[in-house]
Amino acid sequence: MIPTSFPPREEIARLTARMLLEIEAVHFRPQEPFTLASGLPSPTYIDCRKLISYPRIRSTLMDFMAVTLLRDAGFEAFDNIAGGETAGIPFAALVAERLGLPMTYVRKKPKGYGRNARIEGVMTEGQRVLLVEDLTTDGGSKLSFVDAIRETGASCAHTAVIFYYGIFPETIGRLQAHGVTLHHLCTWWDVLAEARASGAFDAGTLAEVESFLSNPRDWQDARKPADPTKSL
């Protein structure tokens, strides 16, 4: 059933953050930072893939995603819902079910040849495709999926994620320059606010996380490993 009532954005963000904290998808470790794929340190880590194992929370968040898309993009904005391999696939299927639309997924690498070599499922020329993923940091990884969709002759002007970092100011501009609008449920700032309200982490940890969120580049530069090729 297509939802027709729209909870306030702030309430969606707060409840999404609360659910992520409840299933322990959120990790704060400023004293022993995580290492990102870029090699840079981060005191924060989030695992949205855990959501598929919590049916009640998963269902609620997909309802939130559906109403966010209907409110912000429109009731007849899409013809096809595409998940990005791998994390986006289950969420794309759930969103497609709620919106009553076909579902496909986009491979990271091509399989075979032709303009549909990265697409699994039926995607046709002229379709308006929504790209669904679990999260985005700076938006960069989404562009490859968008390009693969457009190579089929379909259009892709929107991407939706459960979690958007919300700390790198270039993200929205990068996506907009590629003709893509980002839709999301919550950010690190929403998680930080809910973590403070619930007492999920100690005050010192939250203060250090806030320092990172306020200026992630400076925080990382101060803590990134020394270059072993440089002599003392």
Curated annotation (Swiss-Prot):
5-phospho-alpha-D-ribose 1-diphosphate binds at R107, K108, K111, E133, D134, L135, T136, T137, D138, G139, G140, S141. It comes from Cereibacter sphaeroides (strain ATCC 17029 / ATH 2.4.9) (Rhodobacter sphaeroides). Its cofactor is Mg(2+). It is an enzyme of class 2 (transferase). Pathway: Pyrimidine metabolism; UMP biosynthesis via de novo pathway; UMP from orotate: step 1/2. Homodimer. Keywords: Glycosyltransferase, Magnesium, Pyrimidine biosynthesis, Transferase. This is Orotate phosphoribosyltransferase. One of its GO terms (molecular function) is magnesium ion binding. SUPFAM superfamilies: PRTase-like. Orotate binds at T137. The keyword Membrane does not apply. The keyword Glycosyltransferase applies. Catalyzes the transfer of a ribosyl phosphate group from 5-phosphoribose 1-diphosphate to orotate, leading to the formation of orotidine monophosphate (OMP). Its EC number is 2.4.2.10. It holds the Pfam family Pribosyltran. Belongs to the purine/pyrimidine phosphoribosyltransferase family. PyrE subfamily. Disulfide bonds: none annotated. It comes from the Bacteria. InterPro entries: OPRT (IPR023031), PRibTrfase_dom (IPR000836), PRTase-like (IPR029057). GO terms for biological process: 'de novo' UMP biosynthetic process; pyrimidine nucleobase biosynthetic process.
